[in-house]
């Protein structure tokens, strides 16, 4: 247990994590309320509209990629986060006031989603790489996993609270509460002991621009395999707002309370997955392959569940496998990338993770509208199986994967990874 939470021994990380979990709960409350507002109050159960909101919110990750990684590598990440977190709180406040006063329209939600996406495009790579400023290299995989645990613990609590709040006071107050939730994380950023931060190479030492980040990834078959797998699942598999909202309303005819419970149920699996990842000293690419396979199976089974209770059980497996996959991918890429390149490579990772959602969300939303929500989950299952195939091909081509029987059970073995650029350890 001590090894699972070892990063919390660090004062700066402990302070940051405490503020972040409050903000994360508010963020998940807003996400849940926003989807419900669009699906049930501003449209007549339009999954396509929810997909458009997701596209606007995550699209800037791709469009602003030339700038976001550069900012994360060349500017003080603490100051960047102070600016972005304050801006996100202000946007939540404005949307909340519009909703509470009864003036909100669908185009308002579209506009705020786009603005939030632009701010998040700068916030996400700075926030992800800021972890390496808070802890040493030896604790980095653990800190990354605990960050994901915090995010998914908030996913467990936030939607459940949101369902109750929507039923009692309405969606607008959820947005206002989210605006207040940014106060603790802003306070934590101000209170950090700056002399204890782990300094990275300065802007003058960091090499080149975003193009160098792409060149760096291109020369790394291990990174390419991990990022292609992330693209497939990120674009077509991680559309949980569409999956859960449309299954709740379309397949099970549920209300806001049950929708919130289903969202929280998946988060139980997500927390389990991230805690498992936190225990590993160094994740391996083979773990990504296994997690992608389980994700595909979970989505396929979830698509045929006859009632909300059984669907909720499958959401636990889907959440655990999805977070094992994404957390392990994040850790693998961070620890195997040179510190001077980390911001740009993480910006590429986040652009794929979040920015490909605009490509897949409208497709998944259209499938849910044109056919049914169960077919949309089938798209998610296909993405998991395709990602697993990419990982398998990498291990066969570059690591000489061999499968054999030992004591009547199948076992696998792979060759040791070869050294790569500048002595950076490759993915295992």
Positions of PLM-derived features:
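Alpha-helical transmembrane-bundle signature of multi-pass membrane transport and export proteins
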Residues: 1-427
């Amino acid at each position: 247990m001590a090894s699972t939470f070892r990063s919390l021994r660090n004062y700066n990380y402990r302070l940051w994590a405490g503020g972040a979990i409050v903000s994360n709960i508010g963020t998940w409350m807003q996400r849940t309320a926003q989807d419900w507002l669009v699906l049930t109050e501003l449209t007549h159960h339009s999954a396509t509209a929810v997909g458009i909101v997701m596209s606007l919110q995550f699209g800037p990750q791709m469009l602003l990629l030339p700038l976001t990684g550069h900012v994360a590598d060349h500017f003080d990440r603490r100051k960047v986060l102070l600016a972005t977190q304050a801006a996100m709180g202000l946007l939540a406040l404005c949307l909340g006031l519009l909703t509470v006063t009864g003036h909100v329209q669908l185009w308002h939600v579209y506009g705020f989603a786009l603005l939030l996406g632009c701010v998040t495009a700068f916030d996400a790579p700075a926030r992800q790489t800021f972890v390496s400023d808070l802890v040493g290299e030896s604790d980095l995989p653990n800190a990354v996993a605990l960050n994901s645990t915090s995010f998914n613990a908030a996913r467990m609590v936030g939607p459940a609270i949101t369902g109750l709040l929507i039923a009692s006071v309405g969606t607008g107050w959820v947005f206002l509460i989210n605006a207040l939730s940014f106060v603790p994380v802003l306070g934590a950023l101000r209170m950090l002991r700056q002399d204890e931060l782990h300094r990275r190479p300065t802007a003058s030492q960091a090499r080149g621009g975003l193009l160098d980040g792409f060149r760096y990834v291109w020369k790394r078959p291990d990174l390419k395999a991990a990022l292609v797998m992330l693209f497939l699942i990120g674009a077509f598999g991680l559309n949980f707002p569409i999956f859960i909202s449309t299954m709740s309303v379309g397949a099970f005819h549920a209300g806001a309370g049950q929708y919130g419970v289903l969202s929280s149920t998946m988060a139980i699996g997500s927390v389990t997955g991230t805690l498992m990842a936190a225990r590993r000293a160094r994740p391996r690419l083979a773990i990504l392959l296994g997690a992608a396979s389980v994700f595909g199976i979970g989505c396929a089974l979830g698509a045929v569940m006859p009632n909300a209770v059984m669907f909720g059980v499958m959401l636990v497996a889907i959440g655990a496998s999805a977070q094992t996959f994404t957390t392990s991918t994040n850790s693998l890429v961070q620890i195997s990338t040179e510190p001077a390149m980390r911001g740009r490579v993480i910006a590429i990772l986040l652009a794929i993770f979040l920015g490909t959602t605009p490509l897949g969300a409208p497709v998944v939303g259209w499938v849910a509208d044109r056919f049914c929500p169960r077919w949309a989950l089938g798209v998610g299952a296909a993405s998991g199986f395709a990602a697993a195939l990419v990982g398998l091909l990498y291990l066969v081509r570059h690591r000489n994967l061999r499968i054999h029987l030992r004591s009547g059970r199948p076992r696998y073995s792979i060759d040791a990874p070869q050294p790569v650029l500048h002595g950076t350890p490759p993915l295992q």
